[in-house]
Amino acid sequence: MTITPQEALQRTIEHREIFHDEMLHLMRLIMRGDMSPVMAAAIITGLRVKKETIGEITAAATVMREFARHVEVEDNANFVDIVGTGGDGSHTFNISTATMFVAAAAGAKVAKHGNRGVSSKSGSADVLEALGVNIDLQPEQVAASIAETGMGFMFAPNHHPAMRNIAPVRRELGVRTIFNILGPLTNPADAPNQLMGVFHPDLVGIQVRVMQRLGARHVLVVYGKDGMDEVSLGAATLVGELRDGEVREYEIHPEDFGMQMVSNRTLKVENAGESRVMLLEALGNKPGVAREIVTLNAGTALYSANVAGSIADGIQLAREAIASGRAREKVDELARFTQQFKR
């Protein structure tokens, strides 16, 4: 028997779990626009208050993937998504976007799934536009971009049209809900490997186990203990790693890789223009904190993509990709390739 929205709401009020098949049904109602905004708002708020379970998040992500416009990638060896939940409040430049260029220059294929800034001063879509990249591509054009340049940016609104049914509710609520953690779980290119940053330490263990249930191959979920949704230079980083079906949780420190622990304060930006400048300086091999944090994250992404056998090996490859100028060249390559699809 299917659950009604009213029954689901009662379940959340009593702090009881909504089971997998029930959650599939509820999410399909939301994504089709068949649930009233009042009930949708009540349920997603109730889930947040009770705390979403791994099973509930897995079911919700499964439905979001069902409704997505997919990008078909033929060869998914060394294929990785580099993404953050956002919402860490750090207002740093776009580290994961810079990481994409370095990882691609070092031999990974990257399908980056992102959006405009909501909580940040500059989302991945904003800085890519500032770099001259056309972000408004159709799924088959993104696939061509990945095949040709080793990189593809999937602008979330183009791939999740059903989200428009819940967008006004989310906007009016103005608080974090399950949808804030679903984005990184719903890559439209189905990248089997992932470096995922999260905004809360509890999400490290949760998100990596959701990815395990969703059938991912090699995933590193990270949370910098200074609050960053990246691998941090300013503190230890909590890691949840899925590899060969097994989950391991551990901490890493910059010193483990011969790097100095240094505050991330200098990485703050006010807008996409400032983010662009800092990103290009890092990729241009300008010594400093920006280059180091991009190197650290790219090394981790290359390990996740199975291009490198360890994070340390990945960092070495990332250093070479930046020093050789290949990482900086990737920016112009992506801009050139995507501009041909300008509508």
From Swiss-Prot:
5-phospho-alpha-D-ribose 1-diphosphate binds at residues 84, 87-88, 92, 94-97, 112-120, 124. Keywords: Amino-acid biosynthesis, Aromatic amino acid biosynthesis, Glycosyltransferase, Magnesium, Metal-binding, Transferase, Tryptophan biosynthesis. Pfam families: Glycos_trans_3N, Glycos_transf_3. InterPro entries: Anthranilate_Pribosyl_Tfrase, Glycosyl_Trfase_fam3, Glycosyl_Trfase_fam3_N_dom, Glycosyl_Trfase_fam3_N_dom_sf, Nuc_phospho_transferase. The keyword Magnesium applies. The keyword DNA damage does not apply. Anthranilate 2 binds at R170. Its cofactor is Mg(2+). It catalyses: N-(5-phospho-beta-D-ribosyl)anthranilate + diphosphate = 5-phospho-alpha-D-ribose 1-diphosphate + anthranilate. GO terms for biological process: L-tryptophan biosynthetic process. It is an enzyme of class 2 (transferase). GO terms for molecular function: anthranilate phosphoribosyltransferase activity; magnesium ion binding. Its EC number is 2.4.2.18. Pathway: Amino-acid biosynthesis; L-tryptophan biosynthesis; L-tryptophan from chorismate: step 2/5. Homodimer. HAMAP family: TrpD. PANTHER family: ANTHRANILATE PHOSPHORIBOSYLTRANSFERASE. Catalyzes the transfer of the phosphoribosyl group of 5-phosphorylribose-1-pyrophosphate (PRPP) to anthranilate to yield N-(5'-phosphoribosyl)-anthranilate (PRA). This is Anthranilate phosphoribosyltransferase.
